[in-house]
């Protein structure tokens, strides 16, 4: 296997908190899949959760070489967790099509947060 994509993104959590305070769930509904949105609504720190998912999806879009847009939507990238809590990444629709163009078969993701920031890195591997 070879690396065919690498992306990293960092988000200031307070920026997301302020956006949620101004606009309610508008950003969350745009960024999160339906399953992610359900978790967001029940999360003890929803803005932190949203910031981490936002960073993860931006990192994934960078790894795909498109950014968000150009056929890849936030909704085409799903960030989940294993039963042990490790993050997982799944691609659908435009993101899956772009991954196939890269001969990519698997995505690896790391997400971290500290007091003020959330950061994510995505590595895509080919066959």
Curated annotation (Swiss-Prot):
It holds the Pfam family ACPS. Mg(2+) binds at residues 9, 58. It is found in: Cytoplasm. InterPro entries: 4-PPantetheinyl_Trfase_dom (IPR008278), 4-PPantetheinyl_Trfase_dom_sf (IPR037143), ACPS (IPR002582), Ppantetheine-prot_Trfase_dom (IPR004568). It is an enzyme of class 2 (transferase). One of its GO terms (cellular component) is cytoplasm. This is Holo-[acyl-carrier-protein] synthase. Its EC number is 2.7.8.7. It catalyses: apo-[ACP] + CoA = holo-[ACP] + adenosine 3',5'-bisphosphate + H(+). The keyword Lipid biosynthesis applies. One of its GO terms (biological process) is fatty acid biosynthetic process.
């Amino acid at each position: 296997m070879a690396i065919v994509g690498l992306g990293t993104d960092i988000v200031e959590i307070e920026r997301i908190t302020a956006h949620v305070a101004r606009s309610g769930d508008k950003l969350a509904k745009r960024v999160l899949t339906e399953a992610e949105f359900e978790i967001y609504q029940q999360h003890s720190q929803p803005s932190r959760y949203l910031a981490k998912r936002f960073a993860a999806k931006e990192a994934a879009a960078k790894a795909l070489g498109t950014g968000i847009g150009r056929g890849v939507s936030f909704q085409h990238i799903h960030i989940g967790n294993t039963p042990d809590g490790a993050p997982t990444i799944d691609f659908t629709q435009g993101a899956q099509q772009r991954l196939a163009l890269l001969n990519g078969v698997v995505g690896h993701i790391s997400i971290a947060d500290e007091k003020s920031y959330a950061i994510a890195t995505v590595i895509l591997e080919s066959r």
